[in-house]
Amino acid sequence: MAVDKEVELHAQAWDHALSYITPTALSAAVELEIPDILEDHGGLMSLSELSAASGCPREPLYRLMRFLIFHGIFTKSNDCYAQSPLSRVFTRENLGPYMLMQATPVTRSPAGLSGEALKTGTPLYLKSIRGEDSWNDPAYGFHMRAFTNGMAAHARLTAAAIVTNYPTAFNGVRSVVDVGGRHGMAIGKLVEAFPWVRGIAFDLPEVVADAPPRKGVDFVGGDMFESLPKADAVMLMWVLHDWSDDKCIEILKKCKEAIPTSTGKVMIVDAIINEEGEGDEFSGARLSLDMTMMAMTTQGKERSYKEWVHLLNEAGFSKHTVKNIKTIEFVIEAYP
């Protein structure tokens, strides 16, 4: 049956206009712990069982699940619900906490990517709604616990991708500084997989002061714009995309000072925007991250390969390599 082109275009337009509903509904399911309830149950669950386990009344839960099943998140058989391979990715041990981080009132504010914000260069996401920095304003609603849990989930998954897809990453490396390492989730997972490495989680003093002990990881407080602990390698995981080119060059120069000239390396774990060729499964997500950075920050961004090369050259690195670790980030290794 032929589809009227005008009807098809209008259908696509409606999908775009209402597209924000899908992640919002998925966040609600994660908040209700639906993926974990189904995973822990280990099989099909009736609506009544799922309602009792989640504490959500039957009627809204039915409508929520109907929507998410349509979009391929969960499955249904004989009027009972079950996990799908996709919904398993949103359990508490996977991307569930990151999904909740993206569902806080500030992160979901459409004002950050408004026409006004783009014209003025001041993202309403953080500052212009109340004239102050919402990262430090709990009353506005940015839940720091959600942020911390979300970033920890991201760090855990990215570290696992490095272990699986780049098993030689730390050959010959005895010590690694994880800049912006917060509570050491990423470096802890890496040290666990590569036990000959001594990990150093480096972050602001007030951040590392609250860090729980981790085997093989030392916590050091400081300022990355002043100096870094000496080590064989320095890792920057999801750090440089927060900063302008000039600030990135400053940070990279400090990293270069912290490693041995002949054998050291800086490991940048960050997205690379594809502007040439076909890209991969994560190309769309990386572009979405760039929109997020434009909404969140005044100068942060995701960068193309050419933009990364420019930063490395300006910071004085002589060569670099790029490793695809089959996730949203790559590992860019820069050598003095």
Swiss-Prot record:
Outcome (variant: T298A): Acquired ability to produce salvigenin (SALV), and slightly ladanein (LAD) from scutellarein-7-methyl ether (SCU7Me)
Tissue: Expressed in leaves.
Free-text function comment from the UniProt entry: Flavonoid 6-O-methyltransferase involved in the biosynthesis of polymethoxylated flavonoids natural products such as nevadensin and salvigenin (SALV), aroma compounds which contribute to the flavor of sweet basil, and exhibit pharmacological activities such as anti-allergic, anti-oxidant, antibacterial, anti-proliferative, and anti-inflammatory effects. Catalyzes S-adenosylmethionine-dependent regioselective 6-O-methylation of flavonoids; active on various hydroxylated flavonoid substrates, including scutellarein-7-methyl ether (SCU7Me) and ladanein (LAD).
PANTHER family found in the cross-reference section: O-METHYLTRANSFERASE
Enzyme Commission number(s): 2.1.1.-
Pathway: Flavonoid metabolism
Signal peptide as annotated in the record: none
Active site: H241 (proton acceptor)
Summary of the protein's practical applications: Nevadensin is a selective inhibitor of human carboxylesterase 1 (hCE-1), a key enzyme responsible for the hydrolysis of a wide range of endogenous and xenobiotic esters.
Organism: Ocimum basilicum
Quaternary organization: Homodimer.
Gene: FOMT4
UniProt record, GO biological process: methylation
Protein name: Flavonoid 6-O-methyltransferase 4
Top EC class, one word: transferase
Catalysed reactions, as listed in the record: ladanein + S-adenosyl-L-methionine = salvigenin + S-adenosyl-L-homocysteine + H(+); scutellarein 7-methyl ether + S-adenosyl-L-methionine = cirsimaritin + S-adenosyl-L-homocysteine + H(+)
Keywords: Methyltransferase, S-adenosyl-L-methionine, Transferase
Keyword Flavoprotein appears in the UniProt entry: no
One Pfam family cited in the UniProt record for this chain: Methyltransf_2
InterPro entries documented for this protein: COMT-like, O_MeTrfase_dom, Plant_O-MeTrfase_dimerisation, SAM-dependent_MTases_sf, WH-like_DNA-bd_sf, WH_DNA-bd_sf
Effect noted on mutating T297M: Slight acquired ability to produce SALV from scutellarein-7-methyl ether (SCU7Me). Acquired ability to produce salvigenin (SALV), and slightly ladanein (LAD) from scutellarein-7-methyl ether (SCU7Me)
